[in-house]
Curated annotation (Swiss-Prot):
Recorded coiled-coil stretches: none
UniProt keywords, alphabetically: Metal-binding, Nucleus, Repeat, RNA-binding, Zinc, Zinc-finger
Gene from which the chain derives: ZC3H14
Name of the featured protein: Zinc finger CCCH domain-containing protein 14
Location within or outside the cell: Nucleus speckle
GO cellular component terms given for this protein: cytoplasm; nuclear speck; nucleus
Family classification: Belongs to the ZC3H14 family.
Disulfide bonds: none
PROSITE patterns cross-referenced by the UniProt entry: ZF_C3H1 (PS50103)
Biased composition (Acidic residues): 308-317
Length: 730
């Protein structure tokens, strides 16, 4: 029963490892489900059909592997001599069955005479002996170094349980961990030798107990690569060993080496002591005796059942006498974490690399924005007022462009020394700067630089976009083709960003084409305006050209005293004009009181009028609830039934039913006979005159055009109209 449990546990671990290898999502239920199918002896086709939902394209591969393992297990189980060791050989090595049989037969012979030893991976008790494993091959360091360098092959090895008389002997269990059964088809030594490597756990103990020399028979097992450890029998208690668990003993196997020639000189030394000192763990200098091969193993100790005080004292005395290192522990590395998602659902590495490269390119790449030729953003400084005496000259350089439809003016301010040196030759310099350019769009850039820092507090830096200034007649005399098509025009729209959409021409001046632009009396605007406000200001703004009498003979000094043209804008009245525009915009709303006020959700965006001032003629206001001013709230609010209530109703009132129209009595007279003058009180049954027919609805009739008669008095009840025979006296 215990053998079957161990085999089932290992089969289940192998199935779980294979599922993780295939990339399928593994939980505790799927391996159990597969084990149930194995127990039910499902065929390969049935398993493929049932597991296709979970494994997808890997179903066939998994079922072929599983049935191959089961077939090996059945073939080994049928052999009578290999019953107890067949299953570990399937899961841990790929040796032939004959090799396994030889190892198992020896194990069976030992099991008949010796009790099993319990193996515990979590015990911290002491062991009492030193085990030394060696081989008969050459013992040189070169072979050991070649083993460490050529550690491409992976070892899956266990040491057979040592059958001896003493219960205090140590047992070396180099046993594969459950995670090691995950790799390719349980024989990954040949398929993927470099896939996963773990350092071996090496524990070195010091002891004063005599050691049993371990020998190898010269001719018994030299052909195969397995090392069988033999010990000389020592004294012990056989009855105590019988009580140990036998399940772990069956899982112990012989040491199976992939390359026995290369690893023949390996040795393991274990010196048990009474204590494990954590402070002396760093003594890694004894690496010559430690194997750093990729062997996944665990070294365990047998729990000591006999309390020998003398032995403990001897161990303590030996530790103090020799001063050797008590222990040296090397912990195995943490196994690599495998992804739980299948490869088809995992993130593609190419996409991640592509995203990283695109992000780096976007960071390093600079974006080039195309310049807008019509608009220019200019910072506006606070208001500065400069006296005309301290203002400097600004010289405008004209650059005309063929086909002579537009020209570009650049207003620059020369320094004081340059102004003094240039007299009559300035106009020739201006004409020499005229250039040919077929571009039609032109701008005027006015740059003002002020150098006198004592005469002002702030520097007013503004840029103006003017529309197509034209040349004067004097430049036309120097260059007739340009002078015929150019006119003088300047327009200063604002100290902000403004684009002109039409061409405003000013009267031509017969003087030099030098323009002086000043900002006297122009306050700085409070901020930037929207496009709509700029358009409104453009409509309402006006230019104020101030002509000056110019003496051409005075040169630039005369121009400084008498400015040829000053373009100013009256911003003082701009606030009033904006208020008027706001009033006009408000007047554009429908002059009708909002019927949802004061509960209107649109607020100021509502196109209807919302009252803001109280009505002065209330309660004599004749507009009632349609008044454009505020009336007091009605105390009945929505329950008010008065149709012409002058008060304000916050809630919407229910419309009252319209009164029923009273039908007018028809006065139509028959053409044949006149209307009876006693109608409707006529009681003569044979009256020849016309009696109108009564309406069947009587006074309840609601049709205004009803042609039947509607009495104005109440009709007598039905019982009053009942005829009775008159009583005759006898």
């Amino acid at each position: 029963m215990e053998i079957g449990t161990e085999i089932s546990r290992k089969i289940r671990g192998a199935i779980k490892g294979k599922l993780q290898e295939l990339g399928a999502y593994v939980d505790e239920e799927l391996p159990d489900y597969i084990m149930v199918m194995v127990a039910n002896k499902k065929s390969q086709e049935q398993m493929t059909e049932d597991l296709s939902l979970f494994l997808g394209n890997n179903t066939v591969r998994f079922t072929v592997w599983l049935h191959g393992v089961l077939d090996k297990l059945r073939s080994v189980t049928t052999e009578p001599s290999g019953t107890k060791s067949s299953e570990p050989n399937i899961f841990e090595s790929n040796h032939s069955s004959s090799k396994s049989s030889s190892c198992v037969s020896d194990e069976r012979r030992r099991e008949d005479t010796l009790p099993p030893l319990a193996v515990s991976s979590t015990r911290s008790e002491r062991t009492d002996s030193r085990v030394s494993t060696s081989s008969q091959e050459q013992r040189n360091t070169a072979s050991r170094q070649s083993c460490e360098d050529g550690s491409a092959s992976r070892l899956m090895s266990t040491v057979k349980p040592l059958r001896e008389l003493s219960p205090s002997e140590a047992v070396i269990d180099i046993k594969p961990e459950p995670d090691d059964l995950i790799d390719e088809d349980l024989n990954f030594v040949q398929e993927n030798p470099l896939s996963r490597k773990k350092p071996i756990v090496t524990v070195t103990y010091g002891s004063s107990r005599p050691t049993a020399e371990i020998y190898r028979p010269p001719a018994s097992r030299s052909a195969d690569g397995s090392l069988q450890v033999h010990r000389l029998p020592q004294q012990g208690n056989l009855q105590g060993n019988r009580q140990l668990d036998t399940q772990s003993c069956r899982s112990l196997e012989t040491v199976q080496l992939c390359n026995p020639e290369a690893f023949g000189s390996l040795a393991e030394s274990y010196r048990p002591t009474s204590k494990l000192s954590a402070d002396k763990v760093g003594s890694e200098e004894e690496g010559s005796r430690k194997r750093r091969l990729p062997i996944v193993s665990s070294v365990v100790k047998v729990k000591k059942f006999c309390n020998d005080g003398e032995e403990e004292e001897e161990e303590d005395d030996y530790g103090l006498r020799t001063g050797s290192i008590s222990s040296s522990v090397s912990v195995p590395a943490k196994p690599e974490r495998r992804p739980s998602l299948p490869p088809s659902k995992q993130v593609n590495k190419n996409l991640i690399l592509k995203a990283i490269s695109e992000a780096q390119e976007s960071v390093t790449k600079t974006t080039n924005y195309s310049a807008v030729p019509q608009k220019q953003t200019v910072p506006v400084a606070p208001r500065t007022r400069i006296s005309p005496e301290e203002s400097h000259l600004e010289v405008i350089h004209l650059q005309s462009r063929l086909p002579a439809l537009c020209s570009q003016l650049q207003v620059e301010e020369p320094k004081e020394q340059a102004v003094e040196g240039i007299q009559g030759a300035e106009q020739k310099e201006l004409s020499s700067r005229l250039q040919v350019d077929p571009v039609i769009e032109d701008t005027l850039q006015v740059t003002q630089d002020y150098y006198d820092g004592e005469s002002m507090v702030h520097t007013d830096t503004r840029s103006f976009i003017l529309k197509k200034p034209k040349l004067s007649e004097e430049i036309a005399a120097q260059n007739q083709q340009l002078g015929k098509r150019a006119t003088e025009a300047m327009r200063v729209l604002s100290g902000r960003l403004i684009q002109t959409r039409d061409q405003i021409a000013q009267p031509e001046k017969p003087a030099s084409p030098k323009f002086i632009v000043t900002l006297d009396g122009v306050p700085s605007p409070p901020g930037y305006l929207s496009d709509q406000e700029e358009e409104d200001m453009y409509i309402t703004e006006g230019l104020k050209p101030i002509p000056q009498n110019i003496c051409a003979g005075k040169g630039l000094k005369g121009l400084r005293a008498q400015q040829m043209q000053i373009v100013t804008r009256q911003l003082d009245s701009s606030d009033v004009e904006m208020e008027q525009l706001n009033v006009l915009q408000k007047q554009e709303k429908v002059l009708e009181r909002c019927k949802y006020w004061p509960a209107c959700k649109n607020g100021d965006e509502c196109v209807y009028h919302h009252p803001t001032q109280p009505c002065k003629v209330f309660p004599n206001c004749k507009f009632a609830d349609k008044c454009l001013f505020i009336h007091p709230n009605c105390k009945y609010d929505a329950k008010c039934t008065k149709p012409d209530c002058p008060y304000t109703h916050a809630s919407r009132r229910n419309p009252l039913p319209s009164p029923k129209p009273v039908p007018l009595p028809t006065q139509s007279v028959s053409s044949s006979s006149p209307l009876c003058k006693f109608f409707p009180a006529c009681k003569k049954m044979e009256c020849p005159f016309y009696h109108p027919k009564h309406c069947r609805f009587n006074t309840q009739c609601t049709r205004p055009d009803c042609t039947f008669y509607h009495p104005t008095i109440a009709v007598p009840p039905r019982h009053a109209l009942k005829w009775t025979r008159t009583q005759t006296s006898e």
